[in-house]
UniProtKB/Swiss-Prot annotation:
This is GTP 3',8-cyclase. Belongs to the radical SAM superfamily. MoaA family. One of its GO terms (biological process) is Mo-molybdopterin cofactor biosynthetic process. PROSITE patterns: MOAA_NIFB_PQQE, RADICAL_SAM. Keywords: 4Fe-4S, GTP-binding, Iron, Iron-sulfur, Lyase, Metal-binding, Molybdenum cofactor biosynthesis, Nucleotide-binding, S-adenosyl-L-methionine. It comes from Bacillus cytotoxicus (strain DSM 22905 / CIP 110041 / 391-98 / NVH 391-98). The lineage of its organism: Bacteria, Bacillati, Bacillota, Bacilli, Bacillales. It is an enzyme of class 4 (lyase).
Length: 337
């Protein structure tokens, strides 16, 4: 076990998000709009994706310098063939205490049991509306909520810890905030509202479309009073609340209205092996090239540590500054949310 590595602001490296694929079976307007990610879009070919051996090797190195939690993302990670085999390998690594997955839930019904048996502990399911007419417009594939809701139930039944994520955008699905809160309060499933963010350069973001945490709290609190809950750990992303008189949680991810850059402990690896230190990054460090040129573990580790030590990212603090406004940022579907 090497010494924990900290960045230039003293933030430790604790969480690793690994994108296993850049493809998705949805075309959500805020992430992979169909007019950009159309039939001719050049997704990564299989030979450019990190192999399971390469992912395991990197995860082991990250675990050795303080990473405890791994989250698998995409694209849609359940499109990656044999994903439970990767999870089993990651779950066996010394130092890794938590493995999660973010998914649109379409394939959860079929895969939940195998994922759980492989060592997956928790799953976050993206669902941006409870009413089909709204959800179908958002996902761009005319898919109803039914398979997603079935996937959520399947995940719970096999013993996975389940949370639901909802990106809220004014004029798109803000009408769904209360129906979603009602649905998942009744089911006892934590729901996390995510402020619409300017990730990437293709989702047409502007601040006027953001529904802030304070607005969401007022919308929900008028019907279901809520109170703040204590954070579980340093670097926790969601601001957690509980419905009064209940232990059911609701959370808010406030990248726009209340930056959490000062406590960000997350690194990201894209499906083709680039190492990013911020969700809003403009460039990454190519670890795949090192993996495929007989680079030693010590050499790889030195690169990883150096990148993190020199990390100065605080985009959400700088969002309104002129220098941040025209940055060409990496797309969320490529880097993982």
């Amino acid at each position: 076990m090497h010494e924990k590595v900290r960045d230039s602001f003293g933030r430790p490296l604790q969480d690793l998000r690994i994108s296993v694929i850049d493809r998705c079976n949805f075309r959500c307007t805020y992430c992979m709009p169909a007019e950009v990610f159309g039939p001719d879009y050049a997704f990564l070919q299989e030979e450019f994706l990190l192999t399971f051996d390469e992912i395991e090797r990197l995860a082991k190195l990250f675990a050795g310098i303080g990473v405890k939690k791994i989250r698998l993302t995409g694209g849609e990670p359940l499109l990656r063939k044999d994903l439970p085999k990767l999870i089993k390998r990651l779950a066996s690594l010394d130092g890794i205490t938590d493995i999660g997955l973010t998914t649109n839930g379409i394939h959860l019904t079929k895969q939940a049991k195998a994922l759980k048996e492989a060592g997956l502990q928790r799953v976050n399911v993206s669902l941006d509306a409870i009413e089909d007419n709204v959800f179908q417009k958002i996902n761009g594939r005319n898919v109803s909520t039914k398979p997603v809701l079935k996937g959520i139930i399947a995940a719970k039944e096999v013993g996975l810890e389940v949370k639901v994520n909802m990106v809220v955008k004014k004029g798109m699905n803000d009408s769904q905030v209360l129906p979603m809160a009602t649905c998942f309060k009744e089911q006892g499933i934590p729901l996390r509202f995510i402020e619409f963010m300017d990730v990437g350069s293709t989702n047409g973001w502007n601040f006027e479309q953001v529904v802030t945490k304070q607005e969401l709290i007022e919308m929900i609190g008028n019907v279901y009073p809520i109170e703040p809950a204590e954070p579980h750990y340093f670097g926790e992303v969601a601001k957690r609340y509980c419905y009064i008189g209940s232990d059911v949680e609701v959370g808010f991810i406030t990248s726009v209205s209340e930056s959490f850059c000062s406590s960000c402990t997350r690194a990201r690896i894209s499906a083709d092996g680039k190492f990013y230190t911020c969700l809003f990054a403009t460039e990454g460090t190519d670890l795949r090239a090192l993996l495929r040129t007989n680079c030693s573990d010590n050499e790889l580790l030195q690169v990883i540590q150096d990148v993190w030590r020199y990390r100065k990212d605080r985009y959400s603090d700088e969002r309104t500054e002129e220098s941040a406004k025209n940055r060409a940022k990496i797309e969320m579907s490529y880097i993982g949310g």
